Amino acid sequence: MIVVKIGGRVVKNALQNVIESVLRYPGKLILVHGGGDIVSEYTKRMGMEPTFVTSPEGIRSRYTSKEELDIYVMTMGLINKNIVTQLISKGKTAIGITGVDGGSVIGTRKKRIMILDERGKKRIIDGGYTGKIVSVNSQLISSLTSLVDVIVISPIALDTEESTPLNVDGDQMAFNVARAVKAEALLLLSDVDGVLLNNAVVKKLSKEEAKELATKIGPGMNRKVLMAAESVESGVSKVIIGSGLVPDAINSALAGRGTEIS
């Protein structure tokens, strides 16, 4: 069993490429998808401007109000069902879920978040409807893998205390699911070829080397590298950070294209 995360730019620009790669992959697979660029498009269609905030660490992320949460859930559902439709139409058995379905991924709403305002000053604001993942129902997800070839998961968690879906980070969803099912491999496929150091792709890192390297690379990628090291420590055999834009992206990554952390 492997877990594959495809980033929003891959979803927008190279989805067919990834679907063809899923069709070629012979084993069971969990596919976690992003879709931020498409969410922004639909937000604008609904007459609103998407809102982004920047953390003190320099990480830019979507701010999700109640109105934007509705658009986020609708858009992610559309992406999810489009992927499932294509997989089934081309011969794979597949099911599409969010973390809300069956309470498969439980989260908690971020009550407050710290941001940098337009003057570069730290400020605490209401957290909106973004969340942090608390638990994954590994038994439920594993039971689904016995029924289908591919599970497609949207990055939406369930906050049972506030009875609301939550926008959760797609990488976090993939890491947590991979840890829960003890995946043989976790693939993070985006629009970069791997972890870059001095303009060259780093081919292989131990978890210790990954933690050390994370201090030398930019925000965003450093978070992926740290989460990759944590995943390996918690039972995932290896994490591969690579490109979803290359031909047969999944098998290419498994064959050594990208950065492997193990």
UniProtKB/Swiss-Prot annotation:
Binding site for substrate: G35, G36, R62, N167
One GO MF term: acetylglutamate kinase activity
EC number: 2.7.2.17, 2.7.2.19
Keywords recorded for this protein, A-Z: Amino-acid biosynthesis, Arginine biosynthesis, ATP-binding, Cytoplasm, Kinase, Lysine biosynthesis, Nucleotide-binding, Transferase
Catalysed reactions, semicolon-separated: [amino-group carrier protein]-C-terminal-N-(1,4-dicarboxybutan-1-yl)-L-glutamine + ATP = [amino-group carrier protein]-C-terminal-N-(1-carboxy-5-phosphooxy-5-oxopentan-1-yl)-L-glutamine + ADP; [amino-group carrier protein]-C-terminal-gamma-(L-glutamyl)-L-glutamate + ATP = [amino-group carrier protein]-C-terminal-gamma-(5-phospho-L-glutamyl)-L-glutamate + ADP
UniProt protein name: [LysW]-aminoadipate/[LysW]-glutamate kinase
Entry's transmembrane regions: none
Pathway membership, UniProt: Amino-acid biosynthesis; L-lysine biosynthesis via AAA pathway; L-lysine from L-alpha-aminoadipate (Thermus route): step 2/5; Amino-acid biosynthesis; L-arginine biosynthesis
Record site feature (Transition state stabilizer), residues: K5, K224
Gene3D superfamilies: Acetylglutamate kinase-like
GO biological process: arginine biosynthetic process via ornithine; L-arginine biosynthetic process; lysine biosynthetic process via aminoadipic acid
Entry-linked InterPro entries: AceGlu_kinase-like_sf (IPR036393), AcgluKinase_fam (IPR004662), Asp/Glu/Uridylate_kinase (IPR001048), LysZ (IPR037529)
Function comment: Involved in both the arginine and lysine biosynthetic pathways. Phosphorylates the LysW-bound precursors glutamate (for arginine biosynthesis), respectively alpha-aminoadipate (for lysine biosynthesis).
Record NCBIfam families: argB, PRK14058.1-4
Intracellular or extracellular location(s): Cytoplasm
UniProt keyword Nucleotide-binding, yes or no: yes
Protein family: Belongs to the acetylglutamate kinase family. LysZ subfamily.
A GO cellular component annotation in the UniProt record: cytoplasm
Alphabetized CDD domains for the sequence: AAK_NAGK-UC
